[in-house]
Swiss-Prot record:
Additional record remark: Plants overexpressing TCP14 exhibit altered plant development and occasionally are lethal. Plants overexpressing TCP14 are modestly reduced in size and exhibit enhanced resistance to the bacterial pathogen Pseudomonas syringae pv tomato strain DC3000, and the oomycete Hyaloperonospora arabidopsidis.
Keyword Chaperone in annotation: no
Protein name, UniProt field: Transcription factor TCP14
Pfam families cross-referenced by the UniProt entry: TCP
Residue ranges with Low complexity bias: 54-101
Record InterPro entries: TF_TCP_subgr (IPR017887), Transcription_factor_TCP (IPR005333)
Keywords: Activator, Developmental protein, DNA-binding, Nucleus, Repressor, Transcription, Transcription regulation, Ubl conjugation
GO BP, sorted A to Z: inflorescence development; positive regulation of DNA-templated transcription; regulation of defense response; regulation of DNA-templated transcription; regulation of seed germination; response to abscisic acid; response to cytokinin; response to gibberellin
Subcellular location: Nucleus
Functional summary from the UniProt entry: Transcription factor involved the regulation of plant development. Binds to the Up1 elements (5'-GGCCCAWW-3') in early light-induced proteins (ELIPs, e.g. ELIP1 and ELIP2) promoters to trigger their expression and promote chloroplast biogenesis; this activation is inhibited by OR binding in the absence of light to prevent cotyledon greening. Also supports OR expression. Together with TCP15, modulates plant stature by promoting cell division in young internodes. Represses cell proliferation in leaf and floral tissues.
Length: 489
Protein backbone atom coordinates (compact mmCIF):
# COMPACT_ATOMS: atom_id res chain seq x y z
CA UNK A 1 0.00 0.00 0.00
CA UNK A 2 2.97 2.39 0.49
CA UNK A 3 4.24 2.06 -3.07
CA UNK A 4 1.08 3.27 -4.79
CA UNK A 5 0.71 6.02 -2.27
CA UNK A 6 4.26 7.23 -2.78
CA UNK A 7 3.88 7.23 -6.57
CA UNK A 8 0.69 9.21 -6.35
CA UNK A 9 2.38 11.70 -4.07
CA UNK A 10 5.25 12.01 -6.46
CA UNK A 11 2.86 12.74 -9.31
CA UNK A 12 1.11 15.33 -7.25
CA UNK A 13 4.38 16.95 -6.33
CA UNK A 14 5.41 17.06 -9.96
CA UNK A 15 2.16 18.69 -10.95
CA UNK A 16 2.60 21.28 -8.23
CA UNK A 17 6.00 22.14 -9.48
CA UNK A 18 4.76 22.56 -13.02
CA UNK A 19 1.95 24.82 -12.01
CA UNK A 20 3.97 27.20 -9.86
CA UNK A 21 6.87 28.46 -12.13
CA UNK A 22 9.77 30.97 -11.70
CA UNK A 23 13.16 30.96 -10.03
CA UNK A 24 11.76 31.90 -6.77
CA UNK A 25 9.67 28.85 -6.84
CA UNK A 26 12.65 26.64 -7.54
CA UNK A 27 14.54 28.17 -4.70
CA UNK A 28 11.59 27.71 -2.49
CA UNK A 29 11.25 24.08 -3.60
CA UNK A 30 14.92 23.58 -2.86
CA UNK A 31 14.50 24.93 0.58
CA UNK A 32 11.40 22.85 1.05
CA UNK A 33 13.27 19.68 0.16
CA UNK A 34 16.02 20.73 2.41
CA UNK A 35 13.74 21.16 5.37
CA UNK A 36 11.28 18.34 4.53
CA UNK A 37 13.22 15.37 3.29
CA UNK A 38 10.38 13.02 3.80
CA UNK A 39 7.53 14.78 2.14
CA UNK A 40 5.04 11.91 1.93
CA UNK A 41 5.15 11.42 5.69
CA UNK A 42 4.53 15.10 6.19
CA UNK A 43 0.97 14.75 5.01
CA UNK A 44 0.28 12.14 7.68
CA UNK A 45 1.79 14.14 10.56
CA UNK A 46 0.81 17.48 12.07
CA UNK A 47 1.66 20.77 10.42
CA UNK A 48 3.60 23.28 12.36
CA UNK A 49 2.04 26.71 12.71
CA UNK A 50 5.21 28.28 11.24
CA UNK A 51 4.90 26.19 8.12
CA UNK A 52 1.26 27.13 7.77
CA UNK A 53 2.17 30.78 7.90
CA UNK A 54 5.12 30.37 5.55
CA UNK A 55 3.48 28.13 2.97
CA UNK A 56 -0.07 27.95 1.85
CA UNK A 57 -1.18 25.05 -0.31
CA UNK A 58 -2.50 25.71 -3.70
CA UNK A 59 -5.95 24.63 -4.86
CA UNK A 60 -4.47 21.87 -6.98
CA UNK A 61 -2.62 20.36 -4.07
CA UNK A 62 -5.74 20.42 -1.96
CA UNK A 63 -7.71 18.61 -4.65
CA UNK A 64 -5.03 15.98 -4.94
CA UNK A 65 -5.03 15.47 -1.23
CA UNK A 66 -8.81 15.08 -1.29
CA UNK A 67 -8.60 12.46 -4.03
CA UNK A 68 -5.99 10.57 -2.05
CA UNK A 69 -8.16 10.57 1.03
CA UNK A 70 -11.17 9.37 -0.97
CA UNK A 71 -9.13 6.59 -2.46
CA UNK A 72 -8.10 5.46 0.98
CA UNK A 73 -11.71 5.50 2.15
CA UNK A 74 -12.77 3.39 -0.83
CA UNK A 75 -10.03 0.90 -0.20
CA UNK A 76 -11.09 0.65 3.44
CA UNK A 77 -14.81 0.43 2.66
CA UNK A 78 -14.42 -2.62 0.41
CA UNK A 79 -13.14 -5.03 3.13
CA UNK A 80 -15.68 -3.55 5.52
CA UNK A 81 -18.55 -4.32 3.15
CA UNK A 82 -17.23 -7.82 2.64
CA UNK A 83 -16.94 -8.30 6.38
CA UNK A 84 -20.48 -6.97 6.84
CA UNK A 85 -21.81 -9.46 4.28
CA UNK A 86 -20.04 -12.36 5.95
CA UNK A 87 -21.09 -11.26 9.45
CA UNK A 88 -24.80 -12.32 9.16
CA UNK A 89 -23.76 -15.75 7.94
CA UNK A 90 -21.40 -16.25 10.86
CA UNK A 91 -24.01 -15.10 13.38
CA UNK A 92 -26.57 -17.61 12.03
CA UNK A 93 -24.04 -20.42 12.24
CA UNK A 94 -23.14 -19.44 15.78
CA UNK A 95 -26.79 -19.41 16.79
CA UNK A 96 -27.34 -22.88 15.35
CA UNK A 97 -24.27 -24.18 17.12
CA UNK A 98 -25.33 -22.70 20.44
CA UNK A 99 -28.82 -24.22 20.09
CA UNK A 100 -27.39 -27.65 19.34
CA UNK A 101 -25.00 -27.40 22.25
CA UNK A 102 -27.81 -26.39 24.63
CA UNK A 103 -29.94 -29.34 23.45
CA UNK A 104 -27.08 -31.77 24.02
CA UNK A 105 -26.43 -30.34 27.48
CA UNK A 106 -30.12 -30.60 28.38
CA UNK A 107 -30.17 -34.23 27.24
CA UNK A 108 -27.04 -35.09 29.21
CA UNK A 109 -28.21 -33.22 32.31
CA UNK A 110 -28.93 -35.69 35.20
CA UNK A 111 -32.40 -35.67 36.86
CA UNK A 112 -32.97 -33.92 40.12
CA UNK A 113 -32.01 -36.01 43.16
CA UNK A 114 -34.36 -36.77 46.06
CA UNK A 115 -33.95 -35.09 49.37
CA UNK A 116 -33.14 -38.47 51.00
CA UNK A 117 -31.33 -41.30 49.25
CA UNK A 118 -32.58 -43.95 51.71
CA UNK A 119 -34.56 -46.85 50.24
CA UNK A 120 -37.90 -46.79 52.01
CA UNK A 121 -38.99 -50.23 50.78
CA UNK A 122 -38.47 -53.22 53.05
CA UNK A 123 -36.78 -56.21 51.46
CA UNK A 124 -38.66 -59.46 52.12
CA UNK A 125 -37.22 -62.69 50.68
CA UNK A 126 -35.09 -60.78 48.19
CA UNK A 127 -35.54 -57.52 46.37
CA UNK A 128 -37.46 -58.79 43.36
CA UNK A 129 -40.09 -60.80 45.26
CA UNK A 130 -43.60 -59.85 44.21
CA UNK A 131 -47.04 -61.37 44.63
CA UNK A 132 -48.98 -62.41 41.58
CA UNK A 133 -52.57 -63.47 41.97
CA UNK A 134 -55.45 -64.24 39.62
CA UNK A 135 -57.51 -61.35 38.38
CA UNK A 136 -60.64 -62.58 40.16
CA UNK A 137 -58.79 -62.83 43.44
CA UNK A 138 -57.40 -59.31 43.04
CA UNK A 139 -60.87 -57.99 42.22
CA UNK A 140 -62.25 -59.58 45.38
CA UNK A 141 -59.48 -58.05 47.47
CA UNK A 142 -60.16 -54.61 45.98
CA UNK A 143 -63.89 -54.95 46.61
CA UNK A 144 -63.27 -56.05 50.18
CA UNK A 145 -60.98 -53.07 50.71
CA UNK A 146 -63.77 -50.73 49.65
CA UNK A 147 -66.37 -52.46 51.80
CA UNK A 148 -64.23 -52.56 54.93
CA UNK A 149 -62.96 -49.02 54.44
CA UNK A 150 -59.28 -49.92 54.61
CA UNK A 151 -56.65 -47.50 53.41
CA UNK A 152 -54.72 -50.02 51.32
CA UNK A 153 -55.05 -53.48 49.86
CA UNK A 154 -52.22 -54.70 52.06
CA UNK A 155 -54.29 -53.92 55.13
CA UNK A 156 -57.13 -56.01 53.71
CA UNK A 157 -54.81 -58.97 53.09
CA UNK A 158 -53.51 -58.60 56.64
CA UNK A 159 -57.09 -58.68 57.91
CA UNK A 160 -57.78 -61.84 55.93
CA UNK A 161 -54.73 -63.50 57.48
CA UNK A 162 -56.01 -62.62 60.93
CA UNK A 163 -59.37 -64.19 60.22
CA UNK A 164 -57.74 -67.35 58.89
CA UNK A 165 -55.19 -67.66 61.71
CA UNK A 166 -56.93 -70.56 63.54
CA UNK A 167 -57.26 -72.53 60.31
CA UNK A 168 -53.64 -71.82 59.42
CA UNK A 169 -52.46 -73.01 62.83
CA UNK A 170 -54.58 -76.14 62.53
CA UNK A 171 -53.11 -76.85 59.08
CA UNK A 172 -49.47 -75.95 59.66
CA UNK A 173 -49.09 -75.91 63.41
CA UNK A 174 -46.87 -72.81 63.36
CA UNK A 175 -48.93 -69.89 62.09
CA UNK A 176 -48.02 -67.21 59.58
CA UNK A 177 -44.95 -65.71 61.27
CA UNK A 178 -41.95 -66.23 58.93
CA UNK A 179 -38.80 -67.93 60.11
CA UNK A 180 -36.70 -64.79 59.65
CA UNK A 181 -39.12 -62.37 61.27
CA UNK A 182 -36.42 -61.23 63.71
CA UNK A 183 -34.29 -59.88 60.86
CA UNK A 184 -37.15 -57.99 59.24
CA UNK A 185 -37.54 -54.37 60.27
CA UNK A 186 -41.31 -54.47 60.12
CA UNK A 187 -43.96 -53.34 62.56
CA UNK A 188 -46.94 -55.64 62.86
CA UNK A 189 -49.75 -53.11 63.13
CA UNK A 190 -52.61 -55.48 63.90
CA UNK A 191 -51.12 -58.89 63.51
CA UNK A 192 -53.07 -61.77 65.02
CA UNK A 193 -50.07 -63.91 65.51
CA UNK A 194 -50.04 -66.50 68.23
CA UNK A 195 -46.27 -66.20 68.72
CA UNK A 196 -44.52 -63.76 71.03
CA UNK A 197 -42.69 -60.96 69.21
CA UNK A 198 -39.49 -59.17 70.28
CA UNK A 199 -39.69 -56.06 72.41
CA UNK A 200 -38.85 -53.71 69.56
CA UNK A 201 -41.93 -54.83 67.67
CA UNK A 202 -45.29 -53.40 68.48
CA UNK A 203 -47.67 -55.75 70.24
CA UNK A 204 -50.71 -57.10 68.49
CA UNK A 205 -53.50 -54.56 68.37
CA UNK A 206 -56.30 -57.05 67.87
CA UNK A 207 -57.15 -59.84 70.25
CA UNK A 208 -59.03 -63.02 69.72
CA UNK A 209 -62.58 -63.60 70.80
CA UNK A 210 -63.19 -65.48 74.06
CA UNK A 211 -64.35 -68.52 72.13
CA UNK A 212 -61.01 -68.84 70.40
CA UNK A 213 -58.67 -70.85 72.61
CA UNK A 214 -55.64 -70.32 70.39
CA UNK A 215 -54.58 -67.12 72.13
CA UNK A 216 -50.96 -67.00 73.34
CA UNK A 217 -51.95 -67.10 77.01
CA UNK A 218 -54.23 -70.09 76.48
CA UNK A 219 -51.62 -72.03 74.52
CA UNK A 220 -49.02 -71.34 77.19
CA UNK A 221 -51.39 -72.47 79.91
CA UNK A 222 -52.17 -75.68 78.04
CA UNK A 223 -48.48 -76.42 77.60
CA UNK A 224 -47.88 -75.92 81.31
CA UNK A 225 -50.77 -78.22 82.16
CA UNK A 226 -49.45 -80.90 79.82
CA UNK A 227 -46.02 -80.69 81.43
CA UNK A 228 -47.57 -80.82 84.89
CA UNK A 229 -49.18 -84.18 84.26
CA UNK A 230 -52.45 -83.66 82.46
CA UNK A 231 -54.65 -81.32 80.53
CA UNK A 232 -57.31 -79.73 82.70
CA UNK A 233 -60.68 -79.35 81.07
CA UNK A 234 -63.35 -77.05 82.40
CA UNK A 235 -66.88 -76.77 81.21
CA UNK A 236 -66.83 -73.01 80.35
CA UNK A 237 -64.70 -73.92 77.33
CA UNK A 238 -67.27 -76.26 75.85
CA UNK A 239 -68.13 -73.60 73.30
CA UNK A 240 -64.81 -74.15 71.57
CA UNK A 241 -65.20 -77.91 71.17
CA UNK A 242 -64.79 -77.95 67.41
CA UNK A 243 -61.29 -76.42 67.19
CA UNK A 244 -60.08 -78.37 70.25
CA UNK A 245 -60.35 -81.78 68.63
CA UNK A 246 -56.64 -81.80 67.80
CA UNK A 247 -55.58 -80.76 71.30
CA UNK A 248 -58.12 -82.90 73.16
CA UNK A 249 -58.65 -86.17 71.29
CA UNK A 250 -62.00 -87.74 72.00
CA UNK A 251 -63.64 -84.52 73.10
CA UNK A 252 -66.18 -84.73 70.29
CA UNK A 253 -67.49 -87.99 71.72
CA UNK A 254 -67.86 -86.48 75.18
CA UNK A 255 -71.36 -85.49 76.32
CA UNK A 256 -71.44 -83.35 79.45
CA UNK A 257 -74.05 -84.21 82.05
CA UNK A 258 -75.72 -82.16 84.73
CA UNK A 259 -73.86 -83.94 87.48
CA UNK A 260 -70.53 -83.36 85.72
CA UNK A 261 -71.12 -79.66 85.25
CA UNK A 262 -72.46 -79.05 88.76
CA UNK A 263 -70.38 -81.31 90.94
CA UNK A 264 -67.10 -81.97 89.18
CA UNK A 265 -64.91 -78.93 88.97
CA UNK A 266 -62.28 -79.92 91.56
CA UNK A 267 -58.70 -78.86 91.93
CA UNK A 268 -55.79 -80.94 90.71
CA UNK A 269 -55.28 -82.73 94.03
CA UNK A 270 -58.95 -83.55 94.30
CA UNK A 271 -58.88 -84.95 90.78
CA UNK A 272 -55.99 -87.22 91.71
CA UNK A 273 -57.88 -88.46 94.75
CA UNK A 274 -60.95 -89.14 92.66
CA UNK A 275 -58.91 -91.12 90.15
CA UNK A 276 -57.46 -93.27 92.93
CA UNK A 277 -60.91 -93.84 94.36
CA UNK A 278 -62.22 -94.81 90.95
CA UNK A 279 -59.46 -97.37 90.55
CA UNK A 280 -60.26 -98.89 93.93
CA UNK A 281 -63.92 -98.84 93.02
CA UNK A 282 -63.28 -100.83 89.86
CA UNK A 283 -61.39 -103.46 91.84
CA UNK A 284 -64.16 -103.77 94.39
CA UNK A 285 -66.74 -103.89 91.66
CA UNK A 286 -65.04 -106.90 90.09
CA UNK A 287 -64.88 -108.68 93.45
CA UNK A 288 -68.52 -108.12 94.28
CA UNK A 289 -69.90 -109.02 90.86
CA UNK A 290 -70.65 -112.62 91.82
CA UNK A 291 -72.27 -111.57 95.11
CA UNK A 292 -74.46 -109.06 93.37
CA UNK A 293 -75.67 -111.71 90.94
CA UNK A 294 -76.95 -113.82 93.82
CA UNK A 295 -78.50 -110.90 95.66
CA UNK A 296 -80.41 -109.70 92.61
CA UNK A 297 -82.54 -112.86 92.76
CA UNK A 298 -83.65 -112.06 96.33
CA UNK A 299 -84.16 -108.29 96.16
CA UNK A 300 -86.25 -106.06 93.98
CA UNK A 301 -83.91 -104.12 91.75
CA UNK A 302 -84.97 -101.25 89.52
CA UNK A 303 -82.46 -99.11 87.69
CA UNK A 304 -83.65 -95.85 86.15
CA UNK A 305 -81.24 -93.52 84.32
CA UNK A 306 -78.21 -94.72 86.25
CA UNK A 307 -79.80 -94.32 89.75
CA UNK A 308 -79.84 -97.66 91.58
CA UNK A 309 -82.56 -98.42 94.16
CA UNK A 310 -82.28 -101.53 96.33
CA UNK A 311 -84.21 -102.87 99.32
CA UNK A 312 -82.86 -104.29 102.56
CA UNK A 313 -84.79 -107.56 103.02
CA UNK A 314 -81.67 -109.50 103.94
CA UNK A 315 -81.11 -107.43 107.08
CA UNK A 316 -77.74 -106.01 105.97
CA UNK A 317 -76.72 -103.18 103.69
CA UNK A 318 -76.05 -104.32 100.10
CA UNK A 319 -73.53 -102.62 97.93
CA UNK A 320 -75.18 -100.86 95.00
CA UNK A 321 -74.00 -101.53 91.46
CA UNK A 322 -72.37 -98.62 89.74
CA UNK A 323 -73.69 -97.50 86.40
CA UNK A 324 -71.23 -97.16 83.55
CA UNK A 325 -71.19 -93.40 83.39
CA UNK A 326 -68.99 -90.48 84.26
CA UNK A 327 -68.23 -90.38 88.02
CA UNK A 328 -70.87 -88.47 89.85
CA UNK A 329 -73.81 -90.88 89.96
CA UNK A 330 -76.05 -90.66 92.99
CA UNK A 331 -75.81 -93.77 95.11
CA UNK A 332 -78.95 -94.65 97.06
CA UNK A 333 -78.51 -97.60 99.44
CA UNK A 334 -80.88 -98.91 102.07
CA UNK A 335 -80.19 -98.25 105.74
CA UNK A 336 -78.89 -100.85 108.17
CA UNK A 337 -81.36 -103.25 109.77
CA UNK A 338 -82.39 -102.85 113.37
CA UNK A 339 -81.21 -106.32 114.36
CA UNK A 340 -77.60 -105.17 114.69
CA UNK A 341 -74.96 -106.57 116.98
CA UNK A 342 -72.76 -104.82 119.48
CA UNK A 343 -70.32 -102.99 117.19
CA UNK A 344 -70.94 -100.16 114.80
CA UNK A 345 -71.35 -100.68 111.06
CA UNK A 346 -69.25 -98.67 108.61
CA UNK A 347 -70.70 -99.15 105.15
CA UNK A 348 -68.95 -97.79 102.08
CA UNK A 349 -70.10 -97.77 98.50
CA UNK A 350 -67.02 -97.85 96.34
CA UNK A 351 -65.34 -94.97 98.14
CA UNK A 352 -67.75 -92.42 96.71
CA UNK A 353 -70.34 -92.34 99.47
CA UNK A 354 -69.96 -92.32 103.23
CA UNK A 355 -72.52 -94.69 104.69
CA UNK A 356 -74.00 -94.98 108.17
CA UNK A 357 -71.91 -93.83 111.10
CA UNK A 358 -72.84 -95.68 114.29
CA UNK A 359 -71.73 -96.11 117.84
CA UNK A 360 -72.45 -98.99 120.14
CA UNK A 361 -75.76 -100.76 119.88
CA UNK A 362 -76.48 -101.03 116.13
CA UNK A 363 -76.31 -99.00 112.94
CA UNK A 364 -76.43 -95.23 113.14
CA UNK A 365 -77.96 -92.61 110.92
CA UNK A 366 -76.92 -92.76 107.27
CA UNK A 367 -74.87 -89.78 106.16
CA UNK A 368 -74.65 -88.95 102.44
CA UNK A 369 -71.94 -86.67 101.08
CA UNK A 370 -69.44 -86.22 98.28
CA UNK A 371 -65.72 -86.38 98.95
CA UNK A 372 -63.60 -83.22 98.59
CA UNK A 373 -66.33 -81.20 96.88
CA UNK A 374 -67.36 -78.02 98.61
CA UNK A 375 -70.66 -77.41 96.88
CA UNK A 376 -74.24 -77.10 97.93
CA UNK A 377 -74.86 -80.62 96.62
CA UNK A 378 -72.81 -82.02 99.51
CA UNK A 379 -75.41 -81.05 102.07
CA UNK A 380 -76.10 -83.81 104.54
CA UNK A 381 -79.45 -85.44 104.93
CA UNK A 382 -80.08 -87.48 108.03
CA UNK A 383 -83.27 -89.49 108.35
CA UNK A 384 -84.88 -89.06 111.72
CA UNK A 385 -88.29 -90.54 112.45
CA UNK A 386 -90.23 -89.57 115.53
CA UNK A 387 -90.91 -92.45 117.86
CA UNK A 388 -88.12 -94.65 116.51
CA UNK A 389 -84.78 -94.86 118.34
CA UNK A 390 -81.58 -93.89 116.53
CA UNK A 391 -80.24 -97.43 116.72
CA UNK A 392 -83.25 -98.90 114.91
CA UNK A 393 -83.77 -96.84 111.77
CA UNK A 394 -86.22 -98.74 109.62
CA UNK A 395 -86.18 -96.52 106.60
CA UNK A 396 -85.94 -98.23 103.26
CA UNK A 397 -84.37 -95.41 101.21
CA UNK A 398 -82.73 -92.07 101.91
CA UNK A 399 -82.45 -89.28 99.35
CA UNK A 400 -80.11 -86.33 99.20
CA UNK A 401 -80.91 -82.66 98.88
CA UNK A 402 -79.79 -81.57 95.40
CA UNK A 403 -78.51 -78.12 94.55
CA UNK A 404 -80.23 -78.14 91.17
CA UNK A 405 -83.45 -79.88 90.10
CA UNK A 406 -82.79 -83.33 88.69
CA UNK A 407 -84.99 -84.63 85.89
CA UNK A 408 -85.55 -88.36 85.91
CA UNK A 409 -85.88 -90.37 82.78
CA UNK A 410 -88.92 -92.39 81.81
CA UNK A 411 -90.44 -94.39 84.60
CA UNK A 412 -90.89 -91.91 87.44
CA UNK A 413 -94.05 -93.60 88.58
CA UNK A 414 -92.25 -96.89 88.75
CA UNK A 415 -89.57 -95.28 90.91
CA UNK A 416 -92.15 -93.98 93.37
CA UNK A 417 -94.15 -97.18 93.61
CA UNK A 418 -91.04 -99.31 93.90
CA UNK A 419 -89.68 -97.19 96.72
CA UNK A 420 -92.96 -97.38 98.58
CA UNK A 421 -93.16 -101.15 98.21
CA UNK A 422 -89.62 -101.41 99.50
CA UNK A 423 -90.50 -99.23 102.48
CA UNK A 424 -93.47 -101.39 103.34
CA UNK A 425 -91.49 -104.55 102.78
CA UNK A 426 -88.68 -103.37 105.02
CA UNK A 427 -91.10 -102.32 107.73
CA UNK A 428 -92.92 -105.65 107.64
CA UNK A 429 -89.68 -107.57 108.07
CA UNK A 430 -88.51 -105.36 110.93
CA UNK A 431 -91.80 -104.96 112.80
CA UNK A 432 -93.40 -108.34 112.11
CA UNK A 433 -91.67 -110.13 114.99
CA UNK A 434 -92.33 -107.34 117.51
CA UNK A 435 -96.02 -106.66 116.91
CA UNK A 436 -97.91 -107.94 119.98
CA UNK A 437 -101.29 -106.25 119.68
CA UNK A 438 -103.45 -103.81 117.80
CA UNK A 439 -101.76 -100.77 119.37
CA UNK A 440 -98.37 -101.64 117.94
CA UNK A 441 -99.95 -102.30 114.59
CA UNK A 442 -101.61 -98.89 114.51
CA UNK A 443 -98.39 -97.17 115.64
CA UNK A 444 -96.42 -98.94 112.93
CA UNK A 445 -99.04 -98.04 110.32
CA UNK A 446 -98.95 -94.38 111.41
CA UNK A 447 -95.16 -94.40 111.28
CA UNK A 448 -95.04 -95.78 107.76
CA UNK A 449 -97.70 -93.38 106.58
CA UNK A 450 -95.69 -90.45 107.97
CA UNK A 451 -92.51 -91.72 106.34
CA UNK A 452 -94.24 -92.23 103.01
CA UNK A 453 -95.48 -88.66 103.04
CA UNK A 454 -91.95 -87.51 103.78
CA UNK A 455 -90.56 -89.32 100.74
CA UNK A 456 -93.45 -88.13 98.58
CA UNK A 457 -92.62 -84.52 99.39
CA UNK A 458 -89.05 -85.09 98.20
CA UNK A 459 -90.19 -86.80 95.01
CA UNK A 460 -92.70 -84.05 94.26
CA UNK A 461 -89.85 -81.54 94.21
CA UNK A 462 -87.85 -83.69 91.81
CA UNK A 463 -90.42 -84.45 89.13
CA UNK A 464 -93.84 -83.49 87.93
CA UNK A 465 -95.66 -86.63 88.98
CA UNK A 466 -96.06 -85.75 92.64
CA UNK A 467 -99.80 -86.30 92.75
CA UNK A 468 -99.70 -89.65 91.00
CA UNK A 469 -96.90 -90.79 93.29
CA UNK A 470 -98.96 -89.77 96.32
CA UNK A 471 -101.96 -91.76 95.13
CA UNK A 472 -99.88 -94.82 94.41
CA UNK A 473 -98.17 -94.60 97.78
CA UNK A 474 -101.48 -94.50 99.62
CA UNK A 475 -102.67 -97.51 97.71
CA UNK A 476 -99.47 -99.37 98.47
CA UNK A 477 -99.81 -98.39 102.15
CA UNK A 478 -103.26 -99.90 102.35
CA UNK A 479 -102.03 -103.07 100.72
CA UNK A 480 -99.19 -103.27 103.20
CA UNK A 481 -101.58 -102.92 106.13
CA UNK A 482 -103.77 -105.75 104.82
CA UNK A 483 -100.81 -108.06 104.55
CA UNK A 484 -99.82 -107.30 108.12
CA UNK A 485 -103.32 -108.10 109.36
CA UNK A 486 -103.19 -111.42 107.57
CA UNK A 487 -99.91 -112.22 109.25
CA UNK A 488 -101.32 -111.36 112.68
CA UNK A 489 -104.36 -113.59 112.10
Amino acid sequence: MQKPTSSILNVIMDGGDSVGGGGGDDHHRHLHHHHRPTFPFQLLGKHDPDDNHQQQPSPSSSSSLFSLHQHQQLSQSQPQSQSQKSQPQTTQKELLQTQEESAVVAAKKPPLKRASTKDRHTKVDGRGRRIRMPALCAARVFQLTRELGHKSDGETIEWLLQQAEPSVIAATGTGTIPANFTSLNISLRSSGSSMSLPSHFRSAASTFSPNNIFSPAMLQQQQQQQRGGGVGFHHPHLQGRAPTSSLFPGIDNFTPTTSFLNFHNPTKQEGDQDSEELNSEKKRRIQTTSDLHQQQQQHQHDQIGGYTLQSSNSGSTATAAAAQQIPGNFWMVAAAAAAGGGGGNNNQTGGLMTASIGTGGGGGEPVWTFPSINTAAAALYRSGVSGVPSGAVSSGLHFMNFAAPMAFLTGQQQLATTSNHEINEDSNNNEGGRSDGGGDHHNTQRHHHHQQQHHHNILSGLNQYGRQVSGDSQASGSLGGGDEEDQQD
